[in-house]
Amino acid sequence: ELNAVAPTTEGARANLAWELTRTLTQAADVSQVSISLSGDVLDTQGIPVPPAYSLDTLVGAGPDGVGIVSSSGVTNLSTATDASNPTVSPVDPSLVAWSGTDGVYAQRGGTAVAFLPGQAPLGPSVDRFGWVWGPATASSVSVGGGVDGAFNVSVESEGAGEIHAVRISPDGTRALVLRGTDASAWVGVVERGASGRPLAIRALEQIPLEYGSVVDASWTTSTGIMLV
């Protein structure tokens, strides 16, 4: 039950219902949500089901190129021979990205979709909208995948040091950022435009560690992470 002014349009009401439902159901013990806004019940039945995210797809790189690894072998998606640290989209197994000698490359079904000049030593990240996140500085990360080529997305907390890697959560709402001399891990919110185009990473919070530094990190769910 919420006490606030109800949205005036059906689109705004649907967006509010979606935002509240998706936020609350991220808690493991919440399976269903009913929303009442100043006595007016919002429809939550028509909220679209989120896509199924594949987080266990194995992607490899070798002398024959980049491909998806399965029990039956390797399905090659690219013939790049200098690839390292490959990754794959959480919703599209035909979209792969990797670090090359002169930058980050991405292909979908064998067709090039992005090139990001610079170095991404821990490899790129591909989000659910098809954007490829690659080389970074202390204050921004290079992103590509659209018709306008690579562009920079600002990242807060520049004083925390150079960014080593950016990992986007499967649902595309959060960024896991590895940065600094001692390689600390931070989690922030991905701000996007209406089409899903990334605009900034904000509200970064450092993940506390008892000791040591972070070598690499990954998302295990849209809200769970693993640090190495």
Annotate each PLM feature.
Residues E1-V228:
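Bimodal "functional hotspot" detector
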